């Protein structure tokens, strides 16, 4: 049995993760936390997630309960995630990171910690999205520099980072396949008199509206035809199930930085 800690347990993703753990075999929710001062402290995690009483009370500090879990799953905010990462590093616990919006310096902190503990770090835990990453690599290599490439993503009104981590990862995969540096070729949004499109750029467009769970399309547009690879998520459960699968996969792994391509054996 793999014991799991969910941080941010009272949020939309946290509750879905609790539900996903209850549906999975070989996993047990033993710790669930919320930010200090939250009105949810003391509530039963199962009742909060709508899966019935589990006997796991929402608490404040995962550091005080490291002996009770093997893997910590985090879909919170970058600053909080790094604090939880340090807790896991000191205690020798594995971690699944689904948080997005990290700076390059923060990503380096994750890479350094992964030299000591096993970490799955992926902007999207969905099996479908990770299959799309493989398809994008293939499409980019086949279509090459003959097409214009655009990444369009849409999420709910509450998402705070843009473009999404998934959109950026899709752009990275395409850029790497074409031998480009995304930092040098990315164009984020367009406004005013932009002039003719520069060849070999990768464009990003962002939509924030309503309750859209997550939609991503990468367009390879040539003359006379275009190819579009699209993923649409209709429920957060697809991300939660992927994260839970990653947590189960991590148990017993050696220290290292992994992603969902590793978990799904898509390398």
UniProtKB/Swiss-Prot annotation:
InterPro entries: DapB_C (IPR022663), DapB_N (IPR000846), DapB_N_CS (IPR022664), DHDPR_bac (IPR023940), NAD(P)-bd_dom_sf (IPR036291). Keywords: Amino-acid biosynthesis, Cytoplasm, Diaminopimelate biosynthesis, Lysine biosynthesis, NAD, NADP, Oxidoreductase. Its EC number is 1.17.1.8. It is found in: Cytoplasm. GO terms for biological process: diaminopimelate biosynthetic process; lysine biosynthetic process via diaminopimelate. The active site is at residues 155, 159. Pathway: Amino-acid biosynthesis; L-lysine biosynthesis via DAP pathway; (S)-tetrahydrodipicolinate from L-aspartate: step 4/4. GO terms for cellular component: cytosol. SUPFAM superfamilies: Glyceraldehyde-3-phosphate dehydrogenase-like, C-terminal domain, NAD(P)-binding Rossmann-fold domains. Catalyzes the conversion of 4-hydroxy-tetrahydrodipicolinate (HTPA) to tetrahydrodipicolinate. Belongs to the DapB family. This is 4-hydroxy-tetrahydrodipicolinate reductase. It comes from Thioalkalivibrio sulfidiphilus (strain HL-EbGR7).
């Amino acid at each position: 049995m793999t014991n799991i800690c969910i941080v941010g347990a009272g949020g939309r993703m946290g509750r879905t993760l609790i539900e996903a753990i209850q549906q999975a075999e070989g996993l047990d929710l033993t710790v669930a936390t919320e930010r200090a001062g939250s009105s949810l402290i003391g509530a039963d995690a199962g009742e909060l997630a709508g899966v019935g009483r589990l006997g796991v009370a929402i608490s404040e500090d995962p550091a005080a309960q490291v002996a009770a879990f093997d893997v910590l799953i985090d879909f919170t905010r970058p600053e909080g995630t790094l604090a939880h990462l340090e807790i896991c590093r000191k205690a020798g616990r594995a971690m699944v990171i689904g948080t997005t919006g990290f700076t390059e310096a923060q990503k380096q902190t994750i890479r350094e910690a992964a030299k000591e503990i096993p970490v799955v770090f992926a902007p999207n835990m969905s099996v479908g999205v990770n299959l799309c990453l493989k398809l994008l690599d293939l499409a980019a290599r086949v279509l090459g520099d003959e097409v214009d490439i655009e990444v369009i993503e849409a999420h709910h009104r509450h998402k705070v980072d843009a473009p999404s981590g998934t959109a950026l990862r899709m752009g990275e995969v395409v850029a790497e396949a074409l031998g480009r540096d995304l930092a040098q070729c990315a164009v984020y949004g367009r406004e005013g008199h932009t002039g003719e499109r520069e060849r070999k750029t990768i464009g990003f467009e962002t939509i924030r509206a309503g309750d859209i769970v997550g939609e991503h399309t990468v367009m390879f547009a040539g003359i006379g035809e275009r190819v579009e690879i699209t993923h649409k998520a209709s429920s957060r459960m697809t991300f939660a199930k992927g994260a839970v699968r990653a947590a189960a996969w991590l148990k017993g792994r050696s220290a290292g930085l992994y992603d969902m391509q590793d978990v799904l054996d898509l390398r």
